[in-house]
Amino acid sequence: PAVVRWAIKGVTDPKVYVIDDQTPYGTGLRDAANDYITAQKVNKVGSDSVAQKTADYSATVAKIKASGANIVIYTGYYPDGGALAKALSDGSWKGQFIGGDGVLNSAYIDVAGKAAAEGTKFTAPAVPFEVVANAAQQAAFTKATKLKSAAGHVYVTETFNATNVFLSCIAKGNTTRDKIQSCVSAGTFLTIDGKTKISFTFAGEVKGGAPVGGFQVVNGEIKYFGAV
């Protein structure tokens, strides 16, 4: 649902075209997007299913342009998403291109090219590390990774939180798989900010669902716009 909400935000008379990459991830996100589109009566003008590593997107671009779509939701991964975005730009299509967390990668801009990537939107159940980490945490990240910033790296915050959840359970003497699973599903844990609490189902899902963030390429960089 979030990918559709973020896609149509700010677009007058949205006309949506949905494309998947035929992978389990891509078809799953496609189905979720289509369900929301149907439920909210969003105007969907077309869809396509294009295999990964497609060399020529000209036929797909032609279909999109013929449909009158002003939004393309791509549910695959960034190498193909970037190639499709470039093909759309080269084909003079004007509209909003958006992908999920499979497309949210700084390398997407390199694949698509800065001009084609500009304005692209993304969604992911993630909050950028540089947004929530304090100075000490960011310094520790730089020391451990040799990276000046976590910007452009998805799920750093979530990895930080997950690691500390496991360490917390281990510190309590839970050192087997079964005991750690029971600890995780029964406990309540603080996240990176030291204030927000999370808990998990036995299957490891965040209770209540993880907030989904909206991102967009602005001036050649991926920016975070909060929960969508």
Locate predicted features.
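Extracytosolic ligand-binding ectodomains
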Residues: 1-228
